[in-house]
Amino acid sequence: MAANKTLPTYFCRNCENPLALGEDLISKKFVGASGPAFMFSHAMNVVVGPKIGRKLITGSYVVADVMCSKCGETLGWKYVETFDLKQRYKEGMFVIEKLKLTKRY
């Protein structure tokens, strides 16, 4: 019988503000400005900045920077709109850089 492993909660590395739940983790295969990044379907305790056009590895998007609501640290971005139908699944998702996170079980 497999052990029942609980999912982690992800926190801002700078101020310990809770940002995302393990059940909302979609992928660990993203790349941010500082290296590896995680995609989440939902994020909490964040401030979403203004929409901007940005060219990323997989194409052009409308994104918004995402900051911690407690300390103001820039964490990553939110996909607002894509122009490629194959990438449409990303719309509304949050990408947070691994170096900006800590996790606890």
From Swiss-Prot:
GO terms for cellular component: plasma membrane. This is Protein yippee-like At4g27740. Pfam families: Yippee-Mis18. It comes from Arabidopsis thaliana (Mouse-ear cress). One of its GO terms (molecular function) is metal ion binding. It comes from the Eukaryota. Belongs to the yippee family. PROSITE patterns: YIPPEE. Zn(2+) binds at residues 12, 15, 68, 71. The lineage of its organism: Eukaryota, Viridiplantae, Streptophyta, Embryophyta, Tracheophyta. Residues 8-105 form the Yippee domain. Keywords: Metal-binding, Zinc.
